[in-house]
Amino acid sequence: MGKSLVIVESPAKAKTINKYLGSQYVVKSSIGHIRDLPTSGSSSSKEPAAKGRKSASEAPALSPKEKARRQLVSRMGVDPEHGWKAKYEILPGKEKVIDELRRLAKDADTVYLATDLDREGEAIAWHLREAIGGDESRYKRVVFNEITKKAIQEAFSQPGELDINRVNAQQARRFLDRVVGYMVSPLLWQKIARGLSAGRVQSVAVKLVVEREREIRAFVPEEYWEVHADLGTAKGANVRFEVTREKGEAFKPLNEAQAMAALEKLKASAYSVAKREDRPTSSRPSAPFITSTLQQAASNRLGFGVKKTMMMAQRLYEAGYITYMRTDSTNLSADAIGMVRGFIEDEFGQKYLPGKANVYSSKEGAQEAHEAIRPSDVNLKPTQLSGMERDAERLYDLIWRQFVACQMTPAEYLSTSVSVTAGDFELRAKGRILKFDGYTRVLPQQSKPGEDDVLPEMKEGENLKLIKLDPSQHFTKPPARYSEASLVKELEKRGIGRPSTYAAIISTIQERGYVTTHNRRFYAEKMGDIVTDRLNESFANLMDYGFTAGMEEHLDDVAQGERDWKHLLDEFYGDFKKKLEVAEVSEKGMRANQPTLTNIPCRECGRPMMIRTASTGVFLGCSGYSLPPKERCKATVNLIPGDEIAADDEGESESRVLRGKHRCPICSTAMDAYLLDEKHKLHICGNNPDCPGYEIEEGQYRIKGYEGPSLECDKCGSEMQLKTGRFGKFFGCTNPTCKNTRKLLKNGEAAPPKMDAIRMPELKCEKVDDIYVLRDGASGMFLAASQFPKNRETRAPLVSEIIPHKAELDPKYHYLCDAPQKDPDGRPAVIRFSRKTKEQYVQSEVDGKPTGWRAFYDGGKWKVEDKR
């Protein structure tokens, strides 16, 4: 009897599983996905010659439309008009992995597909079976919610079959996303700007951020005042009260005058306790984590982004420390409940254990077969993890505490409310005393300011002494900006996306440049605004929240075998294609990205400038750009944002920023400010380009973010000015013939000058007809094609390649010429850059992968480290 082959996605998971299976199993990793639809540039638009096909002279010529359709299908890898025929390709670099798996599978009696238990894991398992091939009856599917000895042995004792319905649900999602992305994005390039993209779920998520941005822009903060009074008791205790009512009505002065008038009356009033109420209250623990609540808690308590949270959770799961981290169910297994109840009783005592297990309801549609996210072994404390980085330990600590707390008794408080009268005014103070800590012994709560104040003894009718009155100005706050965590919460609430897709959605909308983050809050970029509008107009259902959520439910139906996946795709595509054809029409189709004409004269030709928006931001472009070539003017003016970013989202800084903005004279929306130069600021309506409103303000302006003197160009000696580009602020030379730039570092200083590019004619490019030049970048030295950006080939240099050019090198790189040129086996030393230490080192490589031999420059000497 031969051995059985077990295939999982990751080496870490393989290593953990291998501990629990006997020697009759061979556990191998596919290292993630092995097949996919064509990636950019991987699929040729040329059709292979077929046996018996007519020659080119005999074959009927394809119409331009049909030729374009075939090229699109070739790029997409899926044909929506011919039964959704798909062309999957082995991913680059995975050929050796597949060859090894085929070889091992050939000698195996059984092939166990032990990929993750969600739809994506099911799809990976199917792709593995399809790519490896052979008798399908040899393949078995095993799933487990946690990588423990018991769970693994149970899964392998009862293997199942691949669930093709779940595979088809994943394929349907992939095909939908591919069709929308590949067919709408070119339309955006044509109508709005190059380099834009659309996505079935991505664009809807951007719409949420854009709509919130518009709510904020339209919001007009209103002033109001609060008055607090510090009062003293007969026993000398001081208590802070808030003035809440005047003559029975809510007290809310609208300006300083009203607040000061109230202060005069309060100064002349006598203060007496009208009522004291003490009542018991309690606080129940919340449910164990699901994917979305884990992401929110990790953001709020640990400051983790969604992507980092899922990365750390993945490592914990693969090491066997937690259950599967992509779940929407709060369900806990009977074994898990028994384990944690025993732990609570042993660790904290009977009074912390409720009479029966706490049960939490999941949202409708949650997969109850899955469990909530919890520790695999509650007895394993966070400090006892082995081989985990600090951030993974912190996340485990959060998961462990939430799990234990969710099965503990409530925290009990004595809440106190005291009302005081002062003439026509009523004042109120609240506080509470913790009587029994309950679940908070494990999971301390984040209290609101003043919530846990302890009020001293005060009896009804007791007179209090006025110590101080404290008036404070406030402004009403606009809707809060989304953070990564709150956007995930909103997506979940609206039924958009699933636990396995939240992190990808959040990452994608940032990578596409439609939104940016400042102080961990999302801001919609102008291009995100424009694209959202155009997609809303041309693809109303695609951008509709209900439609997107409905599609998720339909995909759930496919996974349950209750709906045919190709019928679902056909229904979507029929309507989508009609809308796309209408949008593509030149006149009545999708609105183009029209510029706004201004009265600002072009510095080169005198024609009026226009406000334009590109994928890189807002700028001024000469109206003469559209003229015939001989008369054309290509002058542009970079616009530097002149607005402050709100310092935080919890306070009133957003309101104060809004109050400082100009309001559009046409539509009253808050305007965005940009610096034209040191004497002119341009205010552009937040609804531009739909609203043409703008204003020019004169004054003396200084660019925020730089407090030092102007710089002298290290190349030509001219002045360098601070500018803002797609990737942030930088210094650019004012000499039009000099293209020198230097980044602005976070500390407000200019980055060190870059080394001039060094031509290396002896080094020929590998993929294009060009030679290499040695360049100096943010990640140290690298080789790049001399005709960049036409040719984009780059690679790391060898030590032996830079030595002949030592005289041309910047002295700061001379030490690299003294590095070892080869490892002990004669492999050449490659110069690499460490993002962690921000320093260059050398290492030997085989097929682009480190051999284990490397050398570091430390203390003026090269030190070799050999881990081969």
From Swiss-Prot:
<dbReference type="InterPro" id="IPR013497">
    <property type="entry name" value="Topo_IA_cen"/>
</dbReference>
<feature type="site" description="Interaction with DNA">
    <location>
        <position position="174"/>
    </location>
</feature>
<dbReference type="InterPro" id="IPR023405">
    <property type="entry name" value="Topo_IA_core_domain"/>
</dbReference>
<feature type="site" description="Interaction with DNA">
    <location>
        <position position="173"/>
    </location>
</feature>
<feature type="region of interest" description="Interaction with DNA">
    <location>
        <begin position="197"/>
        <end position="202"/>
    </location>
</feature>
<dbReference type="InterPro" id="IPR013825">
    <property type="entry name" value="Topo_IA_cen_sub2"/>
</dbReference>
<dbReference type="InterPro" id="IPR049330">
    <property type="entry name" value="TOP1_Znf"/>
</dbReference>
<feature type="region of interest" description="Disordered">
    <location>
        <begin position="34"/>
        <end position="70"/>
    </location>
</feature>
<dbReference type="InterPro" id="IPR005733">
    <property type="entry name" value="TopoI_bac-type"/>
</dbReference>
<keyword id="KW-0238">DNA-binding</keyword>
<dbReference type="InterPro" id="IPR034149">
    <property type="entry name" value="TOPRIM_TopoI"/>
</dbReference>
<dbReference type="InterPro" id="IPR013263">
    <property type="entry name" value="TopoI_Znr_bac"/>
</dbReference>
<dbReference type="GO" id="GO:0005694">
    <property type="term" value="C:chromosome"/>
</dbReference>
<feature type="binding site">
    <location>
        <position position="9"/>
    </location>
    <ligand>
        <name>Mg(2+)</name>
    </ligand>
</feature>
<dbReference type="Pfam" id="PF01131">
    <property type="entry name" value="Topoisom_bac"/>
</dbReference>
<feature type="site" description="Interaction with DNA">
    <location>
        <position position="177"/>
    </location>
</feature>
<dbReference type="InterPro" id="IPR028612">
    <property type="entry name" value="Topoisom_1_IA"/>
</dbReference>
<dbReference type="InterPro" id="IPR013824">
    <property type="entry name" value="Topo_IA_cen_sub1"/>
</dbReference>
<dbReference type="InterPro" id="IPR003601">
    <property type="entry name" value="Topo_IA_2"/>
</dbReference>
<keyword id="KW-0413">Isomerase</keyword>
<feature type="domain" description="Toprim">
    <location>
        <begin position="3"/>
        <end position="147"/>
    </location>
</feature>
<dbReference type="InterPro" id="IPR003602">
    <property type="entry name" value="Topo_IA_DNA-bd_dom"/>
</dbReference>
<feature type="binding site">
    <location>
        <position position="116"/>
    </location>
    <ligand>
        <name>Mg(2+)</name>
    </ligand>
</feature>
<comment type="subunit">
    <text>Monomer.</text>
</comment>
<dbReference type="GO" id="GO:0003917">
    <property type="term" value="F:DNA topoisomerase type I (single strand cut, ATP-independent) activity"/>
</dbReference>
<dbReference type="Pfam" id="PF08272">
    <property type="entry name" value="Zn_Ribbon_Topo"/>
</dbReference>
<dbReference type="InterPro" id="IPR013826">
    <property type="entry name" value="Topo_IA_cen_sub3"/>
</dbReference>
<keyword id="KW-0862">Zinc</keyword>
<dbReference type="InterPro" id="IPR013498">
    <property type="entry name" value="Topo_IA_Znf"/>
</dbReference>
<feature type="site" description="Interaction with DNA">
    <location>
        <position position="326"/>
    </location>
</feature>
<dbReference type="GO" id="GO:0008270">
    <property type="term" value="F:zinc ion binding"/>
</dbReference>
<feature type="active site" description="O-(5'-phospho-DNA)-tyrosine intermediate">
    <location>
        <position position="324"/>
    </location>
</feature>
<feature type="site" description="Interaction with DNA">
    <location>
        <position position="33"/>
    </location>
</feature>
<keyword id="KW-0799">Topoisomerase</keyword>
<dbReference type="Pfam" id="PF01396">
    <property type="entry name" value="Zn_ribbon_Top1"/>
</dbReference>
<dbReference type="InterPro" id="IPR000380">
    <property type="entry name" value="Topo_IA"/>
</dbReference>
<feature type="site" description="Interaction with DNA">
    <location>
        <position position="182"/>
    </location>
</feature>
<comment type="similarity">
    <text>Belongs to the type IA topoisomerase family.</text>
</comment>
<feature type="zinc finger region" description="C4-type 3">
    <location>
        <begin position="713"/>
        <end position="738"/>
    </location>
</feature>
<keyword id="KW-0479">Metal-binding</keyword>
<dbReference type="GO" id="GO:0006265">
    <property type="term" value="P:DNA topological change"/>
</dbReference>
<keyword id="KW-0677">Repeat</keyword>
